[in-house]
């Protein structure tokens, strides 16, 4: 059949609305949703005809496509996915998972009115920052604290407050890109601080900073390169040295430690990453860090440091534009409460638990998952192997965590096709593919995920 005839044969919406099955959906759903889904179905077939992808179709084909489209339109676009990649803080999959206490706190303040900006004791308007400031001070040792909506905003607000139309001196090797093409120099530009690069990519000395200090210098800035590492012939100025230099010239020292951990991971066998507490103990005036990376909480930019600087930031007009919402505050409060006891934090905050849980635990879990798959899924090969997980989220660059995985292959379907089908399934499962094998890393899986994985594997060859 020629293209023109195929286009003429496309059914009209009014015609499809008379179909019994479409009428059933019309009784259960709004007319707008049904008509939009019918239009999408007709448009799909029109496009396929114009691209010469089909040479025939039936009204039944159009109706079946309508049913799938309607169900897709009814479903939410923001979906739960199962992370089998072994990347704990997966940037594209929502970064950190919240602790149970944080989730309960969010639900409580979301389904009820709350004292977001109301001082119950005084009976008058209060500050939204008061709900978490004392907690942040307690777990970090800071004089003062505040929170904005992400760490880039925290850096921008701090620089704008300390350094508007003045110079911020920073090492050339610390001008990082933090993902999505957002770069420290660009954030500085929007803060209206003037960037002064010193040193070289791999080596910066104290005299590089000192030689560039003048009457227009506003801040000495240190940026932790949390998402990459320079090895070999390197030199950088320590926080202590910068604090001494700042004191000599009466300049504030600011440090952005990015992923922002409150736990010293070197105690657990990892490479040392600067903690928020250590930066403050060294005398750094202002420290900024993320809430949804190593902290294991919601997306937030946390600013801690000297009270005189934090108070100025709270009064900055930018603060209202960057302020945090009630649900994030509730999640952050619930997360921070766990940190009152480090052992409790490691046990209850999923990010910390996943990173620090032992390889032996995951060996047993991988064996359980393999048994369930073998007992319920035919035509696939399953084996347990040692492998390496990643922290992710631009944290601990180069660090790999020994783990156990389930490797999968089949003579009847390629690894790439398995990956695609799992990703597009009703319960999306995100996996790794390597050397013609699908890899399921149990470090980032929950026990509740195992049954879902088995059920989705059962459907792969249907």
UniProtKB/Swiss-Prot annotation:
Its cofactor is pyridoxal 5'-phosphate. GO terms for cellular component: cytoplasm. Keywords: Cytoplasm, Protein biosynthesis, Pyridoxal phosphate, Selenium, Transferase. It catalyses: L-seryl-tRNA(Sec) + selenophosphate + H(+) = L-selenocysteinyl-tRNA(Sec) + phosphate. Its EC number is 2.9.1.1. It is found in: Cytoplasm. GO terms for molecular function: L-seryl-tRNA(Sec) selenium transferase activity. Pathway: Aminoacyl-tRNA biosynthesis; selenocysteinyl-tRNA(Sec) biosynthesis; selenocysteinyl-tRNA(Sec) from L-seryl-tRNA(Sec) (bacterial route): step 1/1. The modification N6-(pyridoxal phosphate)lysine is found at residue 293. One of its GO terms (biological process) is selenocysteine incorporation. PANTHER family: L-SERYL-TRNA(SEC) SELENIUM TRANSFERASE. HAMAP family: SelA. Converts seryl-tRNA(Sec) to selenocysteinyl-tRNA(Sec) required for selenoprotein biosynthesis. Belongs to the SelA family. This is L-seryl-tRNA(Sec) selenium transferase. It comes from Clostridium botulinum (strain Hall / ATCC 3502 / NCTC 13319 / Type A). The lineage of its organism: Bacteria, Bacillati, Bacillota, Clostridia, Eubacteriales.
